[in-house]
């Protein structure tokens, strides 16, 4: 059984986060305007978790674990690289664009910011990504590989995401939810039953 120490959530008003909101996120975390949009959305949920709980980047146990879950991941960066492959000769494509688009990069950015050294995972998929991510968190807590684990779910706005939503209704709009989970029963029980989207998961566990 898992318990929730803190939670945060952020979402766009019309499927996308406002530019001013993203600017505030970048300012809070010292991010460049060139930072991948997915990372900015991801950190937006972390900023809300900080604001709601009074925690900050120095509050985490250094052995804490991390899971970043997403249905599409940093699809904007992946698509940018694919577009360059189509538009330019292979030797003119920026390798750095692809290097920064791998699905593990957002998790790496969070571990650097929080200076946590526990197990870190990236989980991606559609129908059972959310369930798999939470089961992975529970397994790590039960095994004692980390005293607490930060689970962040995020989606960025994209043409691909819009197309997916037409055929897969549970697909989330541009949003992110963050949960700091523990096996310590002094905190409220983490509720997951019958939940298929980030916002519902957040509202079920906010106190």
Residue ranges and their predicted role:
Residues 1-131, 139-145, 151-207:
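Conserved "HGTGT" condensation-loop signature of ketosynthase/thiolase-family condensing enzymes
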